[in-house]
Design a protein with these regions (language model features):
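Oxyanion/phosphate-interacting regions
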Residues: 1-14, 170-175, 191-254
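Conserved beta-strand segments of alpha/beta enzyme cores
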Residues: 63, 177-180, 225
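Conserved beta-strand termini and adjacent loop/short-helix elements that scaffold enzyme active sites
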Residues: 67, 183-184, 229
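Glycine-rich active-site/cofactor-binding loop and its immediate structural neighborhood
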Residues: 80-121
Length: 254
């Protein structure tokens, strides 16, 4: 399996899916609340169709687990599979905010082997397919991600899911000498850490594997790390696809 070629062949599809997501939002989205009490729109569904169709063309024998496909979330004892989140940050998407992303991560032997993330409004595309092979497309050209480039040990900057930190998160920030943090809700947080714009992120158990798989690959391939609070590896294909606690670090903090 040529993972580099697969990811590069997905890039155009992600640009197209991003443009569709914006056009559908301009027309006015059809929105509803799912059984898990989270929002979904026709934009999520249409982007999912485009992305999963292309992935099936490129890797017909690899299963796809998508947030927006309800019939594929039973425990299939998966080792090698795709995790797709067609719109991560649906709240931002349906409320005309900018940080939502389109995501696909390839899992091989329960670990992230490749990832691709596109933030359509910000027009930022990130992807990776192996160690030291993590990139952002800038002006149409792949630019290698460097998570160390803006590091200042006296001004450690984190991203956070919320402006108000829970006590456990606040304590971890203190241990890591975090000076400032910025709210960021989508998988874009993995990308900005991989790009050296921020230094890390801490989260209690929340969300699901499709929310983090692509970003996990990109950050690790850029030299960073993704572990739980006990410093264990994050593995994929768990029975309920739920995430454990997370600590994301740029290479500078390792």
């Amino acid at each position: 399996m040529n993972i580099e070629k697969i990811i590069k062949d997905l890039k155009l599809t992600f640009y197209q899916a991003g443009e569709l997501s914006i056009q559908l939002r301009k027309k006015g989205l059809d929105k509803k609340i799912k059984s898990d009490n989270t929002p979904v729109s026709n934009g999520d569904i249409e982007v999912n169709k485009i992305v999963t169709k292309k992935i099936k063309e490129l890797t017909p024998d690899i299963p796809i687990v998508s947030e927006e496909t309800s019939d594929n979330k039973s425990n299939l004892n998966l080792n090698t599979f795709w995790l797709v989140d067609p719109i991560d940050g649906t709240y931002d998407y349906i409320n005309n905010l900018e940080e939502f992303t389109i995501n696909a991560g390839l899992i091989v032997n329960k670990e992230p082997a490749a990832g691709i993330i596109y933030a359509p409004v910000k027009k930022r595309l990130f992807y990776s397919y192996g160690t030291n092979d993590a990139f952002e497309d800038i002006n149409g050209s792949p630019t290698k991600l460097d998570s160390t480039k803006n590091f200042d040990k006296n001004q450690i900057k984190f991203v956070s899911y919320s402006n108000k930190l829970k006590p456990e998160i606040e304590n971890l920030h203190k241990k890591l000498n975090v000076k400032t943090f910025t709210k960021m809700k989508s998988s874009l947080k993995f990308c900005v850490i991989a790009a050296g714009e921020y230094d890390g992120y801490v989260a209690e158990p929340r969300a699901c594997e499709w929310d983090i798989a692509a970003g996990h690959a990109i950050l690790v391939h850029a030299g960073g790390s993704v572990k739980d609070f006990e410093n264990n590896k994050i593995l994929y294909g768990k029975k309920d696809f739920k995430n454990p606690s997370l600590i994301l670090k740029s290479k500078s903090l390792l």
